[in-house]
Amino acid sequence: QLSHHVLGIGDRAAQLTELGFHLKRGLLLYGPPGTGKTHTVRHLIAQAVEATVIVLSGEGLAMIEPATTLARRLTPSIVVVEDVDLIAQDRDYSPTGNPLLFSLLDAMDGVAADADVTFLLTTNRTAVLEDALVQRPGRVDLAVEIPRPDAAGRERLLRLYARDATLEADLTDAVARTDGVTASAIKELMRRAVLAALDGGGTT
């Protein structure tokens, strides 16, 4: 679904435009820290081999206007805004408002509907986001939760992060003990487990 929304629309740009549909799209990835939002963004970017990709995070968020101008000129393009809640808090939480919020809204609105531009936003805190960003059509078209992994997902992650280390065939206990744990935490747990085994004279 994510790849289709980000890449599929661009692949069918000519047909969609001819039929009167807009190309500009906004995608919001949300979920607790460490669940894999950034990894998902990287996966999408890796597939967009023909797109201009602009990533804004931290202090770089202040560059939203020139970044969007560049994205309009170099389509197809993807503008990634990481931790968008840093600049797009609801005005009830920040009565004075954040000038960058208005810059973001103006930048998104300034992109023509038929421009092959994707705004890819991430956040850990959907509750504080400005309604004008997430509820107005034409800004965020699709919001997708990146949740903590379920049991099957945790087992896959344990095996993935073990890399070449030898694991017991039955990971039932480890899967149960990691209930509610994020993907990044599982990666760190596996690193510590392998280190402990090596310190104890074991092999991998």
Regions found by a protein language model. Name each.
Residues 147-203:
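Conserved C-terminal "switch" segment of AAA+ ATPases
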Residues 1-172:
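Walker A/P-loop NTP-binding motif of AAA+ ATPase domains
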